Amino acid sequence: MKNEKLSQRLTQVGEFVPQDAILLDVGSDHAYLPIHLVKTGRINKAIAGEVVKGPYESTVANVQSAGLQDQISVRLANGLAAFEPTTDGVNTITIAGMGGHLIAEILEDGRDKLCQVSTLILQPNNGERHLRTWLQAHDFTISDEKILAENDKIYEIIVAHPGQSVDRLT
C-alpha cells in the first residue's frame, strides 16, 4: 500500500467500527480502511468488496502488499453480494464515499443479508435525507453521527443499528 495515511474522513468512519468487529467494507476502494483497522488491531477480519475490476485488482494488490491476505478477503461483487451471512460472520458494514441514494439501493438490494448485522456505518457524499428515510422505513435507529470538513467538503457519517425502532416523527 503506497499511502499509509488514511484520510480524516475514513479515519472517522473507522473510529465507529466496534472493536473486534467482522467487517464488510462495500466499495472498499484500495482497502485502505480495512488495512488500517487490521494493522491498528481494531479488527482481525474483514471483507473488502469491489464491483469494478480495476479497483478490485488495486484492492487485491494493496492487501497482498500489506501481507494481510489471511485477514482481509477481497471479493469482486456488487454491494452486499460480497458476503454470505451464514459463513462469513459479518456483523458490521461500512459504505463510504457514495451517494445516499446508491447506499440505500445497496442496502435494499441486500436487505435479506442484514439479519446478522448489528452496525451500519454509512458516509454518504450526498442524498443524506434519502438514506435517513430508508433507514427509518426499515426500522434502523441512528445511534451516532458526525459531521466533518475535509478538502473544502462537508461529510456526514451515520451509524445505525437494526431492530431498534423508535416512534416516527411527523
What is each PLM-predicted segment?
Residues 2-6, 91-92, 101-170:
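Class I S-adenosyl-L-methionine
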Residues 20-29:
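Conserved class I S-adenosyl-L-methionine
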Residues 12-19, 83-87, 112:
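Glycine-rich helix-loop-beta junction characteristic of Rossmann-like nucleotide cofactor-binding loops
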Residues 41-42, 64-70, 112-115:
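Short helix-capping segments at alpha-helix termini
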Residues 45-50:
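Conserved SAM-binding motif I beta-strand of class I
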Residues 30-43:
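Conserved SAM-binding loop of SAM-dependent methyltransferases across substrates and taxa
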